[in-house]
A protein has these predicted regions:
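Bacterial N-terminal signal peptides that target proteins for export
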Residues: 1-8
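Serine/proline-rich low-complexity intrinsically disordered segments, especially terminal tails, linkers
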Residues: 4, 105-111, 134-136
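Hydrophobic helical h-region of N-terminal Sec-dependent signal peptides
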Residues: 8-16
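N-terminal small/polar-rich segments of proteins
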Residues: 23-123, 142-187
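Short, surface-exposed beta-strand/strand-loop-strand elements in extracellular ectodomains
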Residues: 120-134
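Serine/threonine-rich, repeat-prone extracellular segments and beta-strand-based repeat modules
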Residues: 132, 136-138, 144-147
């Protein structure tokens, strides 16, 4: 076989094996003034489900604390008068925490989980149910141990959650510490 025939055979074989995806949309136009040619191009953007949730100080790993010190202001334990925050750390120092929720999901739920607050010296328990939380009406704060479903998304919401100690029960003198975990789940 001659070199010329071999080259032609190789070129034909390569052309037949070329994938169709390398061919772009095209049009040839010719003529006088106003001649046009156009080509179409399609786009695709793939966006996965996502959720961002923040309670308190901005930053991954920041855990704020809200303090209720019944020694401050001469509050009597168990007198039924609610106690506002008297200190804490980060955004929780005044008992008013910034909350932000962003998600492209059509529905989400927020759950509040945690055991009890445990006394450091007595190992006694103080239930989270003795702490009340309210919201500004944008992001519903769930009761401790409960879950709330939010209205249809997508969501780009901010709110403030305000905490107080109910002070309706009498507990042994101690410092009671505990952590509640708020979890947002896309549904």
């Amino acid at each position: 076989m001659s070199f010329r025939k071999l080259t032609l055979a190789a070129a034909v074989a390569m052309a037949m094996g070329a994938p169709a995806t390398v061919v772009a949309d095209s049009e040839f136009g010719f003529g006088g003034t106003g001649t046009q040619a156009s080509a179409d191009l399609s786009f695709r953007i793939i966006i996965p489900d996502f959720v961002f949730f923040q309670v308190g100080t901005v930053g991954n790993g920041n855990v704020d604390r809200v303090d209720f010190d019944l020694n401050a202001g001469g509050v009597e334990s168990g007198d039924g008068n609610a106690v506002g925050a008297t200190g804490g750390t980060g955004d929780g120092a005044d008992g008013i925490l910034a909350v932000e929720l962003r998600s492209n999901a059509s529905n989400v739920s927020i759950a509040a989980t945690g055991g009890n607050l445990t006394g450091l010296a007595t190992a006694g328990n103080l239930p989270f149910a003795d702490i009340s939380a309210s919201d500004g009406g944008t992001i519903t704060v769930p009761d401790f141990g409960a879950t709330v479903n939010l209205a249809a998304g997508p969501y780009n919401l901010t709110d403030q959650w305000v905490y107080s100690y109910d002070n309706t029960s009498v507990y042994a003198p101690d410092q009671y510490d505990g952590t509640v975990t708020y979890t947002v789940t896309t549904l």
